[in-house]
Design a protein with these regions (language model features):
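Extreme N-terminal leader/targeting segments of oxidoreductases
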Residues: 1-32, 47-51
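Core beta-strand elements of the Rossmann-like FAD/NAD(P) dinucleotide-binding domain
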Residues: 28-30, 222-232
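A conserved short coil-to-beta-strand element within the FAD-binding core of flavoproteins
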Residues: 198-213
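Dinucleotide-binding Rossmann-like beta1-alpha1 core, especially the glycine-rich loop
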Residues: 73-156
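Short hydrophobic core segments
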Residues: 35, 228-238
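C-terminal accessory subdomains/tails of enzymes that are appended
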Residues: 20, 29, 61, 107, ...
C-alpha cells in the first residue's frame, strides 16, 4: 500500500512486555494512574502525558476490547440530539469533530450522508434541522447541507426504494475506525513518555489515611503482582465503572444504565455508493445508519437496556430482525440473515435509570465525580468527545492529586502516525516501516487486506498478545468478515508463535479460542 505523506518516524526496537513490566516495577510513584484502556481512559492518559505528568494506564483485557471497538464508527454532532434540543452537546461534538479531523486525518474522514424522504413535510422539517446543524458547525462545517431531487437522491443512493420518493437531503459528518484510533492513542501515550499496559487488571485500590493512593494489579499472563503508587487515580472503566467505584466505596450506588447497540455488516452490493444512508425514523425513536466502511456496509444501531455486563455481548435475535426489517423498508434488495458478514454489539455506559424500560432518551453526556477518598470517576460519554472528556477529567484530577497546574495541549496535538494531510491508511507515517517487515507482500487471507508484515507490526509495536487482538482490533477482520477472520486464525497464530515463542499447545489454544469467539459474530440462520 502506498504510504501517506509527512515525516517518516522510525518505529524503533520491538516493544517487549517484560520491559514494560520492569519499568512499571521500577517506578516508585506515578503522578496519574488511569484504570481502563477504552476511549475515555486513553484520552485521559494522552492528556496527562502531554502535560508532562508521569502517566500510567492499565487495561484488564486489550485496549478497546469493550465498547470502544464496537461503535457505529461515526464522529458526529448527533443529528437526533439536535431534535431533542440538546444544542450544547451538539455544538461541543461538532467542535471536537473538527479537532479530530485535524489531529488524526489518517483515521477520521469526512462522510456524506443522504436522507431519503417520502413525505414533503419530512423534507421541510429535516431541511430546517440540518440547516441548524450547519449553523452550529460554523467555520468547522464540512460542507453545507442541501436538498436533493428524487433523481439526485437515487443517484447518491443506488439501491434505495423509489416508490413514493419525493427527494432527499445531503449533509456532511465524519466516520472513523474506532479500534485503530484507540491503538493510535495508546501509541501516542508512549510517544509522550507515558506507559500503557494491557492484560494487567486492577484487583484492589490502595488506601492510606482515608485516601486512594494507588492500586494492586496482577499480570494476566505471568501472575506477577504489582503494588502501584499514584498521586491520583482515575476510574475510566466504561460500563464497568460502577464496579471500580465500589472498590473504593463498597456501598456506592450504581450510576450507569447500560444499553446495547447492535450492528450488522453486509457486502457493499447492498448499497454500492460512497454516500451513507440515514433512516430518520425507527419504531423505537432512533435513527438507523447504513455506512460505507472498510469496503462493506455497516448497519446500526439499536438501543436495548441490559442489566448484565457481558465481556462479549451478542446481538439479540430481535435486534437482528429489527435492523434487517428497518433496512428492508428502504432498500430495493432486502438483506437477509444469510447475507450478514459479521454481527456485533457494544454496551453504552449511559447515565440514568431504565425503570421506564428504554434507554433511547438517556444521556450520552458524561459526569465526573470525586469520591471522599479522592477517586476520580467518569461515567458516560462517547468517542466524539473523548478528547474533551480527557481534558476535563485531568483538570479535575490535578487538585485532587496535588499536581502542579499545567494547561491542556491536546487541542492541537497530532496523534501518532499523523500524515500531514488526509489519507486512508490507518498506519499513517508508520506505513514505510511496516512494509519493511517480513511478509509485506503476502496477505493472510484473500478476502482480507491484512498482510503478514502488519501482523508482525501489531505484535512488535502495538502490544498485540493474541489472535483476537490482531484480527479484532489491530485489523478489523472479525468485524468485517467473521468467517474469513475465523479461517485466518491458524496463520495469525503461527506468526504469533514465531514472534512470541509460543509452543504448539498455546498455538492450538489461541486458534480454538478465536474460532469460538468468531462463532458469536456469525448470524444464526
Amino acid at each position: 500500500m502506498a504510504s501517506c505523506g509527512g515525516a517518516q518516524p522510525r518505529l524503533g526496537p520491538t516493544v517487549k512486555r517484560e520491559a514494560l513490566l520492569a519499568r512499571l516495577r521500577s517506578t516508585p510513584r506515578w503522578d496519574v494512574l488511569v484504570i481502563g484502556g477504552g476511549a475515555t481512559g486513553l484520552g485521559c492518559a494522552v492528556d496527562a502525558a502531554a502535560r508532562g505528568y508521569a502517566t500510567l494506564l492499565l487495561e484488564a483485557h486489550d485496549f478497546a476490547k469493550g465498547t470502544s471497538s464496537r461503535s457505529t464508527k461515526l464522529i458526529h454532532g448527533g443529528v437526533r440530539y439536535l431534535a431533542q434540543g440538546r444544542i450544547g452537546l451538539v455544538r461541543e461534538a461538532l467542535e471536537e469533530r473538527a479537532i479530530l479531523l485535524a489531529n488524526a486525518p489518517h483515521l477520521v474522514h469526512p462522510q456524506r450522508f443522504v436522507v431519503p424522504v417520502y413525505r414533503q413535510w419530512d423534507r421541510l422539517m429535516l431541511g430546517v434541522g440540518l440547516t441548524a446543524y450547519d449553523w452550529l458547525a460554523g467555520s468547522r462545517s464540512l460542507g453545507a447541507s442541501r436538498l436533493l431531487s428524487a433523481r439526485d437522491t437515487v443517484a447518491a443512493l443506488p439501491g434505495v426504494k423509489q416508490e413514493g420518493l419525493v427527494g432527499g437531503i445531503a449533509y456532511m459528518d465524519a466516520r472513523f475506525d474506532d479500534a485503530r484510533l484507540a491503538i493510535t492513542l495508546m501509541r501516542s501515550v508512549f510517544d509522550l513518555g507515558g506507559l500503557a499496559i494491557n492484560y494487567l487488571p486492577v484487583s484492589a485500590l490502595r488506601h492510606e489515611a482515608g485516601r486512594v493512593v494507588g492500586a494492586d494489579a496482577r499480570d494476566a499472563e505471568s501472575g506477577a503482582c504489582f503494588n502501584i503508587a499514584a498521586r491520583v487515580v482515575i476510574n475510566a472503566g466504561g460500563v464497568w465503572a460502577d464496579t471500580l467505584r465500589q472498590l473504593d466505596e463498597p456501598q456506592a450506588p450504581a450510576q450507569l444504565a447500560p444499553s446495547q447497540g447492535a450492528h450488522l455488516v453486509l457486502d457493499r452490493d447492498f448499497l454500492p455508493t460512497d454516500s451513507a444512508l440515514l433512516i430518520p425514523h425507527t419504531p423505537d425513536g432512533r435513527v438507523l445508519f447504513a455506512i460505507p466502511w472498510k469496503g462493506k456496509v455497516l448497519l446500526g444501531t439499536t438501543d436495548t437496556p441490559r442489566t448484565d455486563l457481558p465481556l462479549e455481548p451478542r446481538p439479540l435475535a430481535g435486534e437482528i430482525d429489527f435492523i434487517l426489517d428497518t433496512a428492508n423498508r428502504y432498500l430495493t434488495r432486502p438483506p437477509r440473515r444469510e447475507d450478514v458478514r459479521s454481527a456485533f454489539a457494544g454496551l453504552r455506559p449511559l447515565i440514568g435509570s431504565t425503570k421506564g424500560g428504554s434507554t433511547a432518551a438517556l444521556s450520552r453526556e458524561h459526569v465526573i465525580q470525586v469520591s471522599r477518598q479522592g477517586l476520580v470517576s467518569v461515567a458516560g460519554g462517547k468517542w466524539t468527545t473523548y478528547r474533551r472528556m480527557g481534558e476535563q477529567i485531568i483538570d479535575t484530577a490535578i487538585p485532587v492529586g496535588g499536581l502542579p497546574a499545567r494547561p491542556c495541549s491536546t487541542r492541537e496535538l497530532p496523534l501518532h502516525g499523523h500524515p500531514g494531510s488526509a489519507c486512508e491508511d490507518v498506519f499513517g507515517t508508520d506505513r514505510p516501516e511496516v512494509d519493511t517487515l517480513p511478509g509485506a507482500g503476502r496477505r493472510i487471507h484473500p478476502a482480507l487486506t491484512l498482510t503478514e508484515a502488519e501482523v508482525r507490526h501489531a505484535i512488535r509495536h502495538e502490544l498485540a498478545r493474541s489472535v483476537e487482538d490482531i484480527l479484532a482490533r489491530r485489523h478489523r477482520a472479525l468485524f468485517i468478515d467473521a468467517r474469513s477472520a475465523q479461517d485466518s486464525a491458524p496463520a495469525v497464530a503461527a506468526i504469533l508463535a514465531e514472534e512470541l515463542g509460543l509452543d504448539d499447545t498455546q498455538v492450538r489454544e489461541q486458534t480454538e479460542a478465536f474460532r469460538q469467539l468468531a462463532e458469536g459474530f456469525l448470524t444464526p440462520r
